[in-house]
Amino acid sequence: MAVGKEMLYDQLPADVKPRVVWREKFWLTDEALSTYRRSAGLFGHEMHSPIMSIGQGIPAIVCRWAEQTSKGDMWRTIGLGDWLFDLDQPEQAQRVPAAVLALAKDPAAARAQAARARTVVERYQRDTMAVLARKLT
């Protein structure tokens, strides 16, 4: 958390800091989701919050880089390839601001896209549980 404060919060302009909340500890799942539900969507680098967001129908843009694992590929699998960016690729990194603005400017379309992805996830979950039910009975 200290690195994040130093690299992010401390670098913000003085007029922006009063509108930003810095937390010294990780928040609990319910705290995170209650905030995400009130937002236009999420933009992040780790998969936990985006997964929770899509599970609630909240749009989520994900940025990854080579040192992270391939788990970001799940965004393509569930139909959110347009919301997955490889920050090691300059042309992809340059497209991030436009994607975030599009999400914010058309929240209805973004929520519809998130809902479609959630439906895909629910189908995978049903199919997986059906396999387990067959194998375990």
Language-model features and meaning:
Residues 1-137:
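Active-site anion-handling motifs in enzyme catalytic cores
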